[in-house]
Amino acid sequence: MGNSALDLNPPNATFHLSTHGSDWLWAAFSVFGVSLLTVVAWTFTRPRGARLFHQIAIVVLTTGSLAYFSMASDLGATPVPVEFRGEGTRQIWFVRYIQWFITFPLLLLELLLATGLSLSDIFTTLFMSIVLVITGLVAALVPSTYKWGYYTFGVSALFYIWYVLLWHGPHTTFAAGGVLRRGYILAAGYLSFLLLLYPIAWACAEGGNVISVTSEMIWYGILDIFAGPIFLFFFLWELRGVDYATFGLHSGKYTDKSAYAPNTAQAAGTVPATTSTGAAGNV
């Protein structure tokens, strides 16, 4: 049985996704799905208190799986009049921007938590990633030349992200030592290069309408796979031997259930209940 996604969900624009493009998106969805299941299984091999980075990866891969399922099904797009290509409309995939709105800040958070950056620096960097995504979406939805103004705002935010990843972050103190610093520098350089390619893809696709929607899907799909599953597997592998206690990421929320089981004296109210601290703070 062939791919009938476009028959069940007909395209809603002049320049739209092809069946071959949908086939590629199903393949990308499979990559995200298999990666998600792998990370979930990997997470359960980690002790409590050493799962935070794996759980962030689960959120990223779950979001990516949902987005690619939607796009492969030809859902999550809206028609917008084209620029530089005569008459007609082009499918703008808002579901992709929803994906990036969630995943880009989390990918940066995954990376920056390994550094000695302050929470205020991390928060500002995550905000700039949100600015990057939102300005890209607004620019894609604007049919006039004003879209390039939003594009400029987004690229400006990207320069700030590069500054933090490539300069500010590496010059902080890494509590986990030089091994993690080396891994961070490799991961930060890798992610920064990928972030350079996204605005180029946008200018050729939603911005200038130079490439087809199917070519757009292939380009973005490759970038998302390299920025999602491949990046996350590399980063988690680099963290496999690191003592999570050095990060100081204790939430204080998790406590053994036994701590809530009062003895007879506590139940009678004669002895104050105490909270076990041995397992507190695991995330």
Curated annotation (Swiss-Prot):
It is a multi-pass membrane protein. One of its GO terms (cellular component) is plasma membrane. Keywords: Membrane, Transmembrane, Transmembrane helix. The keyword Flavoprotein does not apply. The keyword Transmembrane applies. It comes from the Eukaryota. The chain crosses the membrane at residues 24-44, 52-72, 97-117, 122-142, 148-168, 185-205, 217-237. It is found in: Membrane. Signal peptide: none annotated. Belongs to the archaeal/bacterial/fungal opsin family. PANTHER family: 30 KDA HEAT SHOCK PROTEIN-RELATED, PTHR28286. This is Protein FDD123. It comes from Trametes versicolor (White-rot fungus). The lineage of its organism: Eukaryota, Fungi, Dikarya, Basidiomycota, Agaricomycotina. The gene is FDD123.
